[in-house]
Every structure is written in C-alpha cells, then in structure tokens.
C-alpha cells in the first residue's frame, strides 16, 4: 500500500502525506518490513495514453498505473520515498504480457534536489520538487538540422531534449512494452521543522537502492523481470544512475538501508543508462579546469588562471593515479594525451556522424559557417584548440563545484548545489575538497570527519576503480553533449574507461553540438534495452 492509495485502486487524485522529517520516522516503530513492503497487485488504475515514439509514430497504450507506493517500512518522508509503476496491457489494441519484460527504472533527480512521484497522474509524471525539469514530456525525432544546435536543459534540470523537444524515456519504454518504474528520492534541500537537512548525501542513493530492493523483494508479484532492471537518469540523476549501477549490493550502504526499513533483498541492477552525469565530485574541479580552463566566462572575462592552473595540476595527478586505458586500444589516459583521446574517440566521430546525417546543402552551409572543420566526405577532423573555441563560454567559474565562498542567498537553490549536497544537520553548505576548504578557512583546515565516507558513498568511480565491485552493472549506456560545460568531458569518458577495463559492455558517445541534458538517440537506447535483456517484442 502506498500514500494516497486505497485497497484495490490507487488514488490518482489527492495525496495524504505521512512525512516524518522531524526525525520520528527512521528507527521508529511500525510495520515490519515483510508486512509493509508486499506489493498489492490489485492496487492500480487503468489508464490510456497516446505516446509518440522516437520515429514519430503514435501508439495508443493502455496500462495499469500503480501510484505512490512507499518502498521502505520506516520512511523519513513518504512524499519522496515512494515509486510509481506503469505496466502495459495493450499497445495499439494488441494485448501485451509484461510478466517478464525488462524494467525501466527511471529517476527524475536533477541538481541533487528531491524528486517525487506523489503528484503524478500517469507515466512520465515524476519530477524534481521545487526545481526545474522532469522526466515527462513528448519524445522527439533525432534528425539533425543544418544549424549548430546548442540544445540542452538548464543546469540542475532532470529533463532530456532532442531537436528542441522534451524526451520522456518512461513513456518511450512503456510504448515499447517495458514495465516502467519511477522512483522518488530525497534531495539536498529538504529540511525538517527544526531546520535540519534530511536529504543530503547519501540519502538519494540510499533511497534508489531501497526502491530496487522493494522490486526484488516482490519478485513474482511485481510485473516485469527484476533481474533485468535498466536504470536511467540525467545530470545529477545520471550520476546517481551510474552510482546505482556501480555500487550494486555493496555492504557500504547497509546501515543506511536498515535505518529506513528497506526490504531484505539485493539492490544490484542489470544495466545503467547515464546522461551527462555530474559525478566524481571530489575531482570535478580539476577535471573542469583541464577541459574548460582557458575558455572565457559568459561575461568575456577569464576565470582566475592561478586557481585554474593549480586545479589542472590536481587533475593530472588524479588521472595518472587512475591508470585507465582508452577504448579501442588507445593506451594509458593521462592529462597530456586526453585531448587527443577525446578528439579521436569521441569528438571527431560525433561531428562526422552529425555531418553525415545532413543533406548536402545543409552540410555545405554548416561547413561554411564552421571552417575549423576539415571534411573529407566521410570524416571530420579539427584541433582541440579549435574545438574549445567552437564551444565558447564556460558555464562555471573556478572552482566549478566546491566554491571558495558559500552563497548568501539561500533562496537560490542551484548556487552552491554540491556544497549543499554535503551539508549536514542545520549546516546548509560544507566543503568537500581540501583545496577549497583551505582557500576558505586557511592552510591548517581539515575536512569534516564524515565527508570522506560520504564521498565514497556518492562516487561510482570508487566502486569501479578503488574497490571494484563484483555486484556492479555489467552493461553501460553513457551519453553527453559535446558542448556541455556543466562538467568536464573527461568525467563520462573516465566512467566509460573504468567500466570497460573491468570487462563490462560499454556504449559511450557524445552528441555533436548538443548541450546539457541532450538525448538524440533515445530510440536506439530503447532498442538497446531489448537487445541487452534478450527480450523479444510481442
């Protein structure tokens, strides 16, 4: 039974919340996990919707909609610790048996903000609470245009775009015959009556793991194949999707999961989809300066180049320590050769694909406007310096993530977002790197004692590089716009290289001229799910 539900039919209307953010929830009495976390197979509404697929074709889909199911026995805040499930019944009038269909597990986290499905009235209705973006919206064709698109969403958005239109993976997945699960999760801005933050790290990943455990504990009751869970997310949601995949069944989270009454089941997932993941946070400042350090700000001014140089040096040391090798036999990845790797492995192929998809006249127009590109009729080539000039202004100042000085306007929820993610108690912002901490507080300052553990809990690279996790996802779909300066282009590339080194299947590419939140091959991802899961469409 979930919030707003009655026996037999989930209430799509109003919502009776039982938020226990004052601290009464965790560790309090109540139903045992086994009693509270049994999926009610009859608790659905039957809905019908028209979904436009990635090729532009419309499909009438009738589905069972299970609304706002609380997935833990001792919730801190049910508004966020609940999930929706959508199960296809008929597609274009043809009956669908989704008993063993893949499960698309689509989070709508953005900016590490809270996300809720409590007010959703159907599939794709989840979204950030009090923030921008969401998982909803119509799908769009991925056909390229002649102009240089800068398509994308705002920083902190969980939305995806293609051709200027919103993309909804939950809706596309449902139209493909998959079971769609949309989990809510706590986020960094949530405060109780005493002003204490209860959604900061590691709450978001703990909640997503608890949602997976709920599904696995209800194997045979929940429709769909719980051994074929495909996680998706964008921006911070892409980061936690990658983290969910990398950290499957890790014992590091057990204490947190026990505290909220998570089901006694595993939390490993089969495959991970991550779009523009804002991750590897403790190393993101250095990576950002390596990538975008010489690009001017939108004001035309340069970021502090002394700071930028110091952070680039940190990145070089970090990158060398990873001991990663590039895909396709490139060899060791270092700060010295990463530009060459980005060009050969990702950026030039991305430009080639884009140009190859244009009509002859559109291609001629584009190349005339972008003379830095050499085109031989099949392949595009250019230099790293010219690519940086093409992208233009960097989106963030230096340092990009762990700010030297915290914001004074607490109403701006995106300023100091990562410092807020590592806040605790009534402290809104905290440093999470020694470099920024010491710039702010002095050379002798030390990180708070709990921060290193929380960094490990929030970083997929820990589970792929530092302590390779046997329970991780073995299938990865990673995407990023080439013009996305919300984080460094190396972040996704390192994630892909780390998973590839462990023998995992990795599909990773960049969308040419696209910004933050781009998803121009959503149809390919939907097909990849079926192929990877071994699922045959009915």
Show the residue positions of the predicted features.
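Short beta-strand element of the alpha/beta-hydrolase
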Residues: 98-112
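Alpha/beta-hydrolase active-site loop
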Residues: 198-220
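C-terminal catalytic histidine-bearing segment of alpha/beta-hydrolase fold enzymes
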Residues: 284-288, 329-376, 381-383, 477-484, ...
């Amino acid at each position: 039974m979930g919030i707003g539900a009655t026996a037999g039919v989930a209430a799509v209307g109003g919502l009776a919340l039982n938020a226990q953010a004052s601290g009464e929830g965790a560790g309090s009495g109540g139903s045992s996990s086994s009693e509270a976390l049994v999926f009610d197979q009859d608790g659905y509404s039957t809905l019908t919707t028209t979904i436009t697929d990635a090729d532009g074709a419309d499909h009438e889909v009738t589905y069972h909609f299970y609304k706002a199911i609380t997935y833990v026995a001792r919730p801190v805040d049910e508004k966020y610790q609940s999930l929706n499930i959508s199960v296809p019944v008929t597609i274009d009038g043809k009956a669908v048996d989704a008993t063993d269909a893949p499960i698309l597990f689509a989070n709508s986290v953005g900016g590490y903000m809270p996300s809720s499905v409590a007010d959703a009235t159907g599939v794709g209705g989840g979204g950030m609470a009090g923030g921008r973006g969401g998982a909803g919206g119509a799908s769009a064709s991925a056909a390229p245009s002649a102009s240089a698109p800068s398509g994308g969403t705002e920083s902190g958005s969980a939305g995806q775009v293609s051709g200027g239109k919103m993309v909804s993976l939950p809706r596309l997945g449902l139209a493909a015959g998959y079971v769609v699960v949309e989990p809510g999760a706590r986020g960094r801005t949530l405060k109780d009556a005493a002003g204490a933050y209860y959604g900061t790290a590691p709450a978001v990943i703990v909640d997503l793991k608890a949602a997976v455990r709920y599904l696995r504990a209800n194997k045979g009751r929940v429709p769909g194949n719980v051994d074929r869970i495909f996680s998706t997310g964008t921006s911070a949601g892409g980061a936690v999707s990658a983290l969910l995949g990398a950290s499957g069944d890790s014992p590091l989270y057990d204490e947190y999961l026990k505290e909220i009454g998570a089901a006694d089941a595993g939390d490993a997932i089969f495959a991970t989809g991550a779009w523009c993941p804002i991750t590897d946070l403790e190393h993101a400042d250095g990576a950002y300066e390596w990538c975008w350090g010489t690009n001017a700000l939108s004001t035309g001014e340069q970021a502090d180049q002394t700071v930028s140089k110091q952070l680039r040096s940190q990145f070089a040391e970090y990158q060398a320590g990873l001991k990663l090798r590039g895909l396709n036999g490139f060899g060791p990845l270092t700060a010295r050769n990463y530009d060459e790797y980005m060009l050969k492995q990702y950026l030039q192929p991305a430009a080639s694909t884009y140009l190859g998809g244009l009509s002859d006249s559109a291609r001629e127009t584009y190349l005339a406007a972008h003379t830095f590109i050499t085109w031989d009729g099949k392949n595009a080539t250019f230099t790293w310096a010219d690519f940086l000039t093409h992208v233009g202004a960097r989106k963030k100042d230096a340092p990009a993530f762990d700010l030297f000085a915290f914001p004074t306007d607490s109403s701006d929820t995106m300023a100091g977002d990562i410092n807020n993610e590592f806040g605790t108690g009534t402290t809104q912002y905290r440093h999470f790197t020694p470099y920024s901490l010491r710039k702010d507080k002095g050379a002798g300052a030390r990180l708070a004692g709990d921060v290193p553990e929380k960094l490990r809990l929030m970083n997929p690279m820990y589970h792929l590089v530092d302590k390779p996790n046997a329970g991780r996802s073995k299938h990865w779909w990673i995407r990023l716009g080439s013009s996305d300066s919300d984080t460094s282009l190396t972040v996704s590339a390192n994630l892909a290289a780390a998973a590839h080194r462990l023998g995992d299947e990795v599909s990773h590419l960049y969308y040419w001229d696209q910004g933050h939140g781009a998803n121009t091959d959503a149809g390919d991802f939907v097909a990849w799910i079926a192929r990877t899961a071994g699922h045959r469409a009915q």
